[in-house]
């Protein structure tokens, strides 16, 4: 079965510039480890920049990385999980990317 790497970018602050509560990251981590058995986190934040309605926004983000078998059930999990993350982190969009990987 082929594997994919999933990268999730989660904001450290809400859109009103208040800090996201640590419990929300902990809950996300628990869910992913419970579902897939492992998780990697890039602890130093990455910076992001985006434009909406002519206004420029900057984000500080944490990256969660999960490697998992590419199955229809995995795809369904990510679609549902993304919607929960959008609510949890009060975001219009949460960026989750997937790409094939080969384990050696």
PLM feature segments, named:
Residues 1-104:
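Positively charged, small/polar-rich N-terminal and surface patches that mediate targeting and assembly
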């Amino acid at each position: 079965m082929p594997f994919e790497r999933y990268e999730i970018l989660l904001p450290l602050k809400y859109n009103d510039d208040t800090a996201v509560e640590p419990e929300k990251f902990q809950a996300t981590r628990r869910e992913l480890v419970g579902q897939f058995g492992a998780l990697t986190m890039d602890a130093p934040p990455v910076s992001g920049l985006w434009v909406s309605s002519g206004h420029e926004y900057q984000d500080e983000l944490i990256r969660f990385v999960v490697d998992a078998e590419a199955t229809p059930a995995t795809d369904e999990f990510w679609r549902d999980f993304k919607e929960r993350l959008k609510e949890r982190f009060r975001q219009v969009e949460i960026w989750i990317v997937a790409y094939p990987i080969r384990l050696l």
